[in-house]
A protein has these predicted regions:
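Terminal, non-catalytic protein-protein interaction segments that mediate quaternary/complex assembly
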Residues: 1-269
Length: 269
């Protein structure tokens, strides 16, 4: 398989799909269809094995194992050239994940070589705590602590105004959704979610087709909520206001609803 995937763990999204949701992606990972440092591809294909499945199998059989390390960094393709220049614009910032079971719960240590405080940290926290929750579901255990080590944590001058001008949210609604599912159900669910996401970005997609897409009775509510947000955003980008509102009205996650309101306000500002 090619490295065209810009993955979010069990779901793997092609470069074109990711750019639909983030039109500025090429500014950070370079132009072209291939995305060199795609995390999901690295975790599931790059090294010749599915690291997530191997981790699940190892921890299922030997819960006390301290040898499970998920690798995203590949020295052969990620080390700088001899003159110190980057080998590619999209070098993985996250280098390894270390899941381990302690006292019957799944702990997670994430190690990051370089971490943008504004545009990196929030996304990494969401990405890898989600993966921790998904893996815990596969293993049939609860989540324990999540710890993140950033070797080079930095803030760019261009982002200072946004960071220092921000204020903590008050009375934030908790996210009560759980992504934890048994492995087989999880793989089927993410496969269907991936199929729907790929369909959402097709240029010929009609409004009524997108409206049917967010009706997913077979899925758990947490995944229906996730899909509702994606459908709402796909509708917003196409100017289908009624569908955008209708999709979010089906979302039962109060945290998602609050964040959606803030997102729309930001986009309209």
């Amino acid at each position: 398989q090619s490295s065209t995937y810009r993955a979010r763990f069990p779901v793997q999204l092609r470069g074109a799909t990711a750019e639909f949701w983030n039109s500025k992606l090429c500014n950070f990972v370079g132009s072209g269809p291939d995305l060199h440092g795609a995390y999901g591809f690295r975790l599931r294909h790059h090294f010749g094995l599915d690291q997530l499945v191997r981790a699940y199998e190892a921890l299922s059989h030997t819960p006390e194992s301290r040898q499970v390390v998920l690798q995203m960094w590949d020295a052969g393709s990620d080390l700088p050239r001899e003159d110190g220049t980057p080998s590619d614009p999209d070098i993985p910032c996250n280098v390894i994940s270390m899941p381990k079971i302690r006292d019957g719960k799944l702990e997670w240590l994430q190690i990051i070589r370089s971490n943008d405080l504004f545009l990196g940290v929030p996304h990494n926290l969401v990405q890898f705590t989600c993966l921790q929750e998904i893996m815990a579901g596969w293993l049939g255990v609860e989540c324990a602590s999540y710890n993140q080590i950033s070797d080079s944590l930095h803030l760019y001058n261009r982002d200072e105004r946004d960071v220092f001008g921000s204020r903590p949210l008050s009375n934030v609604a908790p996210n009560t959704d759980s992504l934890a599912l048994p492995r087989e159900e999880s793989e089927v669910t993410f496969g269907e979610l991936e199929r729907r996401i790929e369909w959402m970005i097709t240029p010929e997609l009609r409004e009524e087709e997108l409206e049917r897409m967010f009706r997913w009775d077979a899925a758990r509510q947490a995944y229906r909520n996730m899909l509702a947000v994606l459908v709402a955003e796909a509708a917003r980008r196409r100017g289908w206001t009624d569908l955008e509102t209708g999709a979010m009205s089906t979302c039962t996650n109060s945290a998602f609803k609050e964040l959606w309101i803030r997102w729309v306000q930001r986009m309209e500002a």
